[in-house]
Curated annotation (Swiss-Prot):
Family assignment from sequence similarity: Belongs to the WD repeat PROPPIN family.
Chief site of localization: other
Nucleotidyltransferase in keyword set: no
Species assigned in the record: Xenopus laevis
Protein name stated in the entry: WD repeat domain phosphoinositide-interacting protein 3
GO cellular component labels: cytosol; lysosome; phagophore assembly site; phagophore assembly site membrane
GO process annotations (BP): autophagosome assembly; autophagy of mitochondrion; cellular response to starvation; glycophagy; nucleophagy; pexophagy; protein localization to phagophore assembly site
Amino acid sequence: MNLLPSNPHGNGLLYSGFNQDHGCFACGMENGFRVYNTDPLKEKEKQEFLEGGVSYVEMLFRCNYLALVGGGKKPKYPPNKVMIWDDLKKKTVIEIEFSTEVKAVKLRRDRIVVVLDSMIKVFTFTHNPHQLHVFETCYNPKGLCVLCPNSNNSLLAFPGAHTGHVQIVDLASTEKPPVDIPAHEGILSCIALNLQGTRIATASEKGTLIRIFDTSSGHLIQELRRGSQAANIYCINFNEDASLICVSSDHGTVHIFAAEDPKRNKQSSLASASFLPKYFSSKWSFSKFQVPSGSPCICAFGTEPNSVIAICADGSYYKFQFNPKGECTRDVYAQFLEMTDDKL
């Protein structure tokens, strides 16, 4: 979740994002970066720079390498550079420069993927990175891109050349034609892969529908309705076995859907009437909760099977528990920016 150009909360938070398995989340700050354990919440790393903001932080599971991009009022690094930080040495060990601003970075153990506003470049994850591939995208100011972290699956997904399309390439065999999915009519706002790389979830800027596709065939598996009013989708994430997804939006809500068993999702009692519009047959979330502050947030499933974590732009952390009926209760609340590593 990129909070540039301005975070209204004035807490210095520029960016927050989960690592590949959601076990940690990282924050880019006006004066450095921080890393937290997601559940239970615990500050793991706090790197402060005397002068310099970090607008993007990408972790590689829990290893010592992080990708940093400078940003904020006084960027620590030029915004057109990717810096690979070694947290054991407490310094940058790799630097890659581009002619335009870096929008996002994705890592896997063997690759560095850099997202620019209309192309994606793939490099070897070596001391002297070697460029392997370049993929053109439509205009992509949000830096949308997902990289499967699974060692047996090298899928990379990103907005295609056509509006609303998702393109999926296999980095292990790029000679294979990419899978092109016409996911939405409008501009994409969010994409997410499950951990195994077998499913991709998508949302458009309209934000009313979430669609789930099979990554190998491109076939639509499920269409889920977040709501009837347009919304800005901040985050979509699958749980570990891809049976559930959680979705956060600017309506201050986090919705939970069944991704594999559609019978769990709510449906209108009028759904069986064939003459009614498609809206009434929609699959709605079986559970949802309101983030009390209404602040922009990212969400992911916790370590317990029926728990969801929300990380908010105002520095608040929420853990909610839900039951099979969809009833939701708040379990934990904390201010993660104010804690120190010995508090929890």
